[in-house]
């Protein structure tokens, strides 16, 4: 008989410092951020967080979070910047913070054990030269 083991994944993404305060988008001037803290939260149908894990970016601004089990409604959010000059978490139109959704559900066509998410960025307090 086959034993049932929980699914094991890694969620991987990048964190940048967006040195152009006036732009919300990552661009050619954006800098990868080492030591930034991120958090993965997965919620149930009532929007209650049922799975959560935090992590930190490496020297290349990349984080890799281990995940056990299938989860619905998951997203990565920025928690803390490693740079005092670039610590603002951008807000979206409705005042919510920027997040990256990730599919960790059982009902997906994604078969890779590493799930890649879109990059996130902190915003600098002022524009750098060239913005």
Curated annotation (Swiss-Prot):
<dbReference type="GO" id="GO:0008270">
    <property type="term" value="F:zinc ion binding"/>
</dbReference>
<keyword id="KW-0325">Glycoprotein</keyword>
<feature type="binding site">
    <location>
        <position position="45"/>
    </location>
    <ligand>
        <name>Zn(2+)</name>
    </ligand>
</feature>
<keyword id="KW-0964">Secreted</keyword>
<dbReference type="Pfam" id="PF01190">
    <property type="entry name" value="Pollen_Ole_e_1"/>
</dbReference>
<feature type="binding site">
    <location>
        <position position="73"/>
    </location>
    <ligand>
        <name>Zn(2+)</name>
    </ligand>
</feature>
<protein>
    <recommendedName>
        <fullName>Major pollen allergen Pla l 1</fullName>
    </recommendedName>
</protein>
<keyword id="KW-1015">Disulfide bond</keyword>
<comment type="similarity">
    <text>Belongs to the Ole e I family.</text>
</comment>
<feature type="disulfide bond">
    <location>
        <begin position="17"/>
        <end position="86"/>
    </location>
</feature>
<feature type="binding site">
    <location>
        <position position="88"/>
    </location>
    <ligand>
        <name>Zn(2+)</name>
    </ligand>
</feature>
<keyword id="KW-0862">Zinc</keyword>
<dbReference type="GO" id="GO:0005576">
    <property type="term" value="C:extracellular region"/>
</dbReference>
<feature type="disulfide bond">
    <location>
        <begin position="20"/>
        <end position="131"/>
    </location>
</feature>
<keyword id="KW-0479">Metal-binding</keyword>
<feature type="glycosylation site" description="N-linked (GlcNAc...) asparagine">
    <location>
        <position position="107"/>
    </location>
</feature>
<feature type="disulfide bond">
    <location>
        <begin position="42"/>
        <end position="74"/>
    </location>
</feature>
<dbReference type="InterPro" id="IPR006041">
    <property type="entry name" value="Pollen_Ole_e1_allergen"/>
</dbReference>
<keyword id="KW-0020">Allergen</keyword>
<feature type="binding site">
    <location>
        <position position="21"/>
    </location>
    <ligand>
        <name>Zn(2+)</name>
    </ligand>
</feature>
């Amino acid at each position: 008989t086959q034993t049932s083991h929980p699914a094991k994944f890694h969620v991987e993404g990048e964190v940048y410092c967006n040195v152009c305060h006036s732009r919300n988008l990552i661009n050619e001037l954006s800098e990868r951020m080492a030591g930034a803290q991120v958090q993965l939260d997965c919620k149930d149908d009532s929007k209650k967080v049922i799975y959560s894990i935090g992590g930190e970016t490496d020297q290349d601004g990349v984080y890799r979070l281990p995940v056990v089990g299938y989860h619905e409604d998951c997203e990565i959010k920025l928690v803390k910047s490693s740079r005092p000059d670039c610590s603002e978490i951008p807000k979206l139109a409705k005042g919510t913070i920027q997040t990256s959704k990730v599919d960790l559900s059982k009902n997906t066509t994604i078969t890779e054990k590493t799930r890649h998410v879109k990059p996130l960025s902190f915003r600098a307090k002022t524009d750098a030269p060239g913005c």
